[in-house]
Amino acid sequence: MEIVWIVLLLGAGVIIYNHMYRKKMYREIDRLEAWKIELMNRPVPDELAKVKQLNMTGETEQLFERWRQQWDEIVAVKLPNVEEQLFDTETFLDKYRYRQARKLIGQIEDGLRRLEEEVHQIIDEVNELIGSEEQSRTEIEELRAVHREAKKTLLAYRYTFGAAADLLDVRLTEAEKQFESFAKLTEAGNYLAARGVVQELKQELDSLATMMEEIPALLSECQTSLPAQLAELADGYREMEQSGYILDHLHIERTLAEKQEKIGQCLAMIGELRIEEAKQTVAELKEEIDTLYDLLEKEVLANQYVQTEMPRIGGMLTELAAEAKETSAEAMFVQQSYHLPPSDLEKYRSIEKQMHQLQKRFLLIEDRVAEAKTAYSLLREELEQLVGQIDMMKEEHEQFRLMLQALRKDELIAREKLDDMRKKLSESLRLVQKSRLPGLPEPYALELTEAKNSLQNVAARLEEKPLDMPAVDRALEEAKVSVERLYERTVEMIEQASLAERAIQYGNRYRRRYPAVHKGLEEAEFLFRHYDYEEALRQAVATIESVEPGAFDRVQKLWQADNEDEQ
């Protein structure tokens, strides 16, 4: 019974699915049918009727016939074929041949899409032709007005265009022929070709209008402004030469001749309507002329610099020479009391040598100024270099002078450090005396002797003449290490001795009960009396810890408490 129900349910499902799928396919057919009808109703005939209003000759006639044939084929052949395919699709559906129906629907959709594109293309081309005719008709009248205005301007102001006027005339006459060509193409129905003529004509007239606007200004530059500037430069050059300026290195006369020749080339470019080249050449000429002005101005400013700065630079050298002389005397004095490293002596000799070279160089520049055979710009460069070297030497001289002053300062600092270390050593000895130790261990006594000797060595170094500060600094560093180590060893030794003594006292309570403790403490006392406080502490701690673990911690606490009370 269950199997029967399952079969019935499956059958019902198949029937429902089949019904839904057929319904969906019929909706697809209806959509394609509507698309086909919409294409058939497109206003292509109306658009083609607009073309008939144009001159139906030449290119227009050929295009019209092609579009009409395309549309007739779409309506009479291609759309009926689509209708037949839709009918075949319905037949496949009625026979439940869904796969064939689905495949045919895809083919119909592709075909309608191609027809859609073809119809769009026809309408777009028609609109382009009609729009081209309308736009060309409007623009050609505007261009005629531009052409008339250009001819009037050329006639009225011909003198402002110079040699370019004849070629402008030729170009405007050639433009008239293009107007005639446009009329013939339009009359022959070749509207698209006529449109191309309009575009070319517009480009040509725009170019001529731009030229006619720019040529007068360019001619003014080349015929008036630039030659006037060259003449002004030539006059200025001659005046400066007469005033004593040396300008041979600028080659002004040759450069001015080159600029004059370049102006002639620019005029030729304008006459040939090579306006962009002419504009670039004029811009280059302006920049080059500005450069010439700058070069002459540079010489004037350099002359002012030389006249005003020479005395000041001479004063700088005189002042520096006086300072160097004082430093030389100071260095001689310092050498009697201090040892100067070879590098410092070499530095000072280098400063003296540079000083002589700078003075010699300044005298040479003075001679060249007096001879008046060198350009002021070159003299200025040399003076500026000289000032830079003077500034560098002043800095080196100041550093050397400060180094000499620092030597005395370093000596005072070294003596202060020696006093501090002596106090540190005295503090170590005071701690030893205060602790009332029975004696000093031999290693400690050796360290004490070493520390005293290191301080004596520093004192001896400080009394040497000349004083060698690097050697003093090395001796100070050695003494510092020795004294610091002695102080630390002193504190450690006193602490060990005090703890050893306290541990022995603490262990006395176990002497009678434990022979081993008695023996261990006796050994610790022996070591203590022989100044071996470190071993005495170790022996005492080991002895009391053997009978009372943690005893040394208690000893330390008692010892710390005693120290705090004393403080």
UniProtKB/Swiss-Prot annotation:
Q: Which residues lie on this side of the membrane: Extracellular?
A: 1-2
Q: Which InterPro entries match?
A: EzrA
**Where in this chain does the entry annotate a coiled-coil region?**
97-158, 268-304, 346-497
Q: Where are the transmembrane segments?
A: 3-21
Q: Where in the cell is it found?
A: Cell membrane
- Tell me, which GO biological process terms does this entry list? division septum assembly; septin ring assembly
Key word Cell membrane present in the record?
A: yes
| Cytoplasmic face residues | 22-567
Q: Which UniProt keywords apply?
A: Cell cycle, Cell division, Cell membrane, Coiled coil, Membrane, Septation, Transmembrane, Transmembrane helix
Question: What domain of life does the UniProt record list for this protein's source?
Answer: Bacteria
Query: Topology versus the membrane, per the UniProt entry?
Result: Single-pass membrane protein
Give the chief site where it resides.
membrane
Gene Ontology CC annotations of this record = plasma membrane; septin ring
Q: What does this protein do?
A: Negative regulator of FtsZ ring formation; modulates the frequency and position of FtsZ ring formation. Inhibits FtsZ ring formation at polar sites. Interacts either with FtsZ or with one of its binding partners to promote depolymerization.
NCBIfam families recorded: PRK04778.1-7
Name recorded for this polypeptide: Septation ring formation regulator EzrA
Species in which this protein is naturally found: Geobacillus thermodenitrificans (strain NG80-2)
Tell me the classification of the organism that encodes this protein.
Answer: Bacteria, Bacillati, Bacillota, Bacilli, Bacillales
